[in-house]
Amino acid sequence: MKRAGTLRLLSDLSNFTGAARLRELLAGDPAVLVRCSPDGRHLLLLRPPGSPAPQLLVAVRGPGLPLERAWPEGDPSPLDVFFVPWLARPALILVWESGLAEVWGVGMEPGWKLLQSTELCPDGGARVMAVAATRGRLVWCEERQPGVKDQPEQLSTAFSHRVCFKTLETSGEAGTKLGCTHILLHHCPLFGLIASRKDLFLVPTTNTWSGVAHLLLIWSPSKGKVIVAAPSLGLSHSKSLNPKQGDTWDFRTLLRGLPGFLSPREPLAVHTWAPSSQGLLLLDLKGKVSLVQCHGGTRTVGILQEAPVSLKGSAALGTFHGTLACVLGSTLELLDMSSGRLLEKKVLSTDRVHLLEPPAPGMKNEEELETRGALRLLSALGLFCVCWETPQGLELPSDKDLVFEEACGYYQRRSLRGTQLTPEELRHNSMFRAPQALASILQGHLPPSTLLTTLRAELRDYRSIEQLKAQLVAGDDEEAGWTELAEHEVARLLRTQLTGDQLAQFNTIFQALPTAAWGATLQALQLQPDRSGRLRSQAPPDVWKKVLRAPTAGKEHPNGILPPFELLCQCLGQLEPQWLPPFVKLAQQQGGPGWGAEGPSLPLYRRALAVLGEEGKRPEALELELLLGSGRPKAVLQAVRQLIKKEEWERALEAGLALDASSPLLRSEIFKLLLAEFAQHRRLDAHLPLLCRLCPPEVAPHELLLLLRTHLPDDEGTTPFPEPGAEPPLTVGLVRALLEQTGAQGRPSGPVQSTYEDILWDPGTPPPTPPRGPTASLPASDHPGQEAWVPPGQGLGAADVGVHL
């Protein structure tokens, strides 16, 4: 079972004085203005100009005399009529377009009498366009004609209005009178005035200049401030203002300090405005109802099933017990203000229905206690209230219970378990955090003070940006101002997802102000160089995830828009290219799995190389650094080949030595490349110690010799010495150092595995000396091929002869 919205009859109007006249006016004229007194005992009806008498009727419930006023044909009727709020005795204020204001009240004697008559515009040349009464003040918007003495300059038609107010003061037996005049706003466009119990809303009308018709102002007298709000932009700004101390605002000066509010926007297409306890309700021509809150924020309340046909159609809005009520013609729709869900829709028997504000808090009335706060409807059939009725015996669950019940059904539909989930299990199981978080939010775990503390930094940044925009509009220190603005904007964009319009804006800032944009990025990523020349970052992973996100596979960004990482590499390559390789290397360390686009994505070093230009046109030194720092085998081998081609032997050797033990295959490939160069020429001999260090320890001597033999030049001569001017050949002495490196771990035990290992492990002891006595010469024919033995020290040693391997 659910609660049902009901219409309860409070009165058939027979207990009001002049009931017949009251029913006649309510049934006859749909454009009649209806107001209710704060105590709920008086009903006021004002008919539009040109209507038959009486044009004004005040009916009283219970004892009392009604008030009827009529004005002769040709005389203007009042522009508006108000009950004076927050006073014990009922009082009325009538305001004419000419500026005439009359105060009527009920004194000790029965009946209504005129208490005061005054001119709101005593200097003449002005007319009242809108008027409202709020919290002991009468506020009006008057149109000032050009040429008035107190105006310093000729005003344009668009800004020829000003907003003024008079205080309502009690005066003994006289009851109420209007006090002194104060000016709230100079040189403003035409505004409509709508008063709630605490604030005054200055809203645009159909005649407001289109350039500012998307703005509205909120004046909070108790707080002494004016709030400028732009609902379509989602912006609001507060300014301190205390008219009692002589404070006033020039509307044009006010807008100059808020350049962000002047973005071209369509005027607010509002059909109906209505005050509420939470702010100002507005209904647009599409049927959407929004709430402008007292702090300037705007949120959508709901969308009606039936939208207004035109501006001429009647509509009324009101709220009660967290419910929005809208009367559109003869249809009443009730919506939940928290969710926007349609609760109920009723068809009324008449289309001439007026919504009345609830009685003021603390006012005594004769209605039942359960109707307090309910919405009241007035028609010729009577006075009704709209309220919710809960069936007896039904206990409504709390919001927290409803969350766990709904979550229980949600998880049960998606669960693979056979057991049944219960709300109690969700309450105490820490695995299901979403319903617990939502329940804590509904429970109000964050008071306004805590929320304000959380948002204070964001609000401070927003305020500083608005001040900076005003400084730029004024033309003060433009270069520094634009730099600071770019830094703020880059910092803001890095907190977004950096897609779509945000990414395009990010590119635009880097193109216009690259130095300032990179400085802001430096702060956002918290980049700092260490003593070894490397970059370090303390930025959270979420920031790096946004920066390193790769473009979607198969989709190129239009108009040259680069992804964040490519844009940063391009900017860094132009400003400080020496820091590009360390930045890319740091980015490789920060990158996590799944941070690229869907599908395979390019390595970061290749993405950085792509923005430096086409292959062959890139800065060679920068390309080498990126290839060597990538850690990718193909990239490192490509860099080593380029170094060998440039004959930068030491750098090529250091690139191989820089590899740790986790890359033995890559290190071995680099050694083979350099060993091939070592076998072909002698330009690498000066770096033989580094080549020996690079030699893998697992390479056997015979493998080393086979590698050398593979790369030996084929055009060597047969003579032991090189010809004059020719490059010396590879010698055993040079090879010996490499052979020793292959056995650095100690001579293996067991049988000799290689023909050359006995040479490598020869301890250096010479063979026994032959006897010194004369020996008989053996005929050469007995020992063919055997040469005479040469004593040690007489002849050439093996190391001194150029032996061709």
Swiss-Prot record:
Protein name per Swiss-Prot or TrEMBL: BLOC-2 complex member HPS6
Tissues where this protein is expressed: Widely expressed, with lowest expression in skeletal muscle.
Disease: Defects in Hps6 are the cause of Hermansky-Pudlak-like syndrome, a syndrome characterized by hypopigmented eyes and coat, melanosomes greatly reduced in number and morphologically bizarre, kidney proximal tubules secreting lysosomal enzymes into urine at greatly reduced rates, platelet dense granules deficient in critical components, such as serotonin and adenine nucleotides, leading to functionally abnormal platelets and prolonged bleeding times, and mast cell granules undergoing unregulated 'kiss-and-run' fusion at the plasma membrane.
Compartments where located: Microsome membrane; Cytoplasm, Cytosol; Early endosome membrane; Lysosome membrane
Biological classification of the source: Eukaryota, Metazoa, Chordata, Craniata, Vertebrata
Residues covered by region (Disordered): 743-805
One GO CC term on file: early endosome membrane
Gene: Hps6
A GO biological-process term: protein secretion
